[in-house]
Design a protein with these regions (language model features):
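Helix-loop-strand module that forms the ligand-binding subsite of alpha/beta enzymes
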Residues: 34-128
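N-terminal beta1-alpha1 ligand-phosphate binding loop
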Residues: 1-26
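Glycine-rich phosphate/pyrophosphate-binding loop and the adjoining helix
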Residues: 128-168
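Short gly/ser/thr-rich secondary-structure transition/capping motifs
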Residues: 27-35
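Residue-level preference for long, well-ordered alpha-helices that form the structural scaffold
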Residues: 10, 75-78, 82, 142-145, ...
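A structural signal for isolated positions on well-ordered beta-strands in alpha/beta enzyme cores
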Residues: 2-4, 30, 101
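Short, well-ordered alpha-helices that flank and scaffold nucleotide-derived cofactor binding pockets
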Residues: 19-23, 27, 91, 120, ...
Length: 168
């Protein structure tokens, strides 16, 4: 199954989860940032999985993402702001007809959901949900990921691939 796992990541946590999901889906899955997820890459995919961090209790806006530059002094490393926000990427996504899923990285107690917003936008573009939105936890605002989350992400990818291939 050809799959693209698209991510917005600022401190590497969401990117790591995306790579684990792609590994779980199988050898024809690729993880790529919103900057690299071109319309050509998306058109070739049977499954699109998209994920972003929870910002401001939802999917971050472009101005919220740009505001992360002010976090550089507090964070262990500067945020990666080199790629478009997931919201911007989704706004540029053309109509599709394949399967899709969504995930988010977040602190456990935060209300709201980026993943539900992502999946809703994918559905509005014509994609059919392949799984319920998934949450992966970080230990603090900048990470790292909680123990076991990479393994859980890989398992989630494998479960989706199995379900979509019709295997019992």
């Amino acid at each position: 199954m050809k799959a693209v796992v698209v991510y917005e990541s600022h401190w590497g946590n969401t990117a790591a989860i995306a790579r684990a999901i792609a590994e779980g889906i199988g050898p024809e899955a690729r993880a790529m940032s919103t900057a690299d997820a071109t319309s050509e890459a998306i058109a070739e995919a049977d499954l699109i999985v998209a994920g972003a961090p929870l910002l401001g209790f939802s999917l971050g806006t472009e101005s919220m993402v740009k505001g992360l530059a002010g976090e550089a002094a507090k964070a262990p490393s500067p945020p990666d702001l080199s790629h478009p926000s997931m919201r911007s990427w989704l706004e540029g996504l053309g109509k599709g007809s394949g399967r899709a899923a969504a995930f988010e990285t977040r602190i456990w107690w935060s209300p709201g959901s980026a993943a539900k917003t992502i999946l809703g936008k994918l559905q509005a573009a014509g994609y059919t949900p392949a799984a319920k939105p998934e949450r992966f936890m970080v230990k603090g605002r900048y990470g790292p990921l909680k123990d076991g989350e990479l393994e859980r992400a890989k398992a989630w990818g494998a479960e989706m691939a199995k379900a979509l291939s019709g295997q019992p």
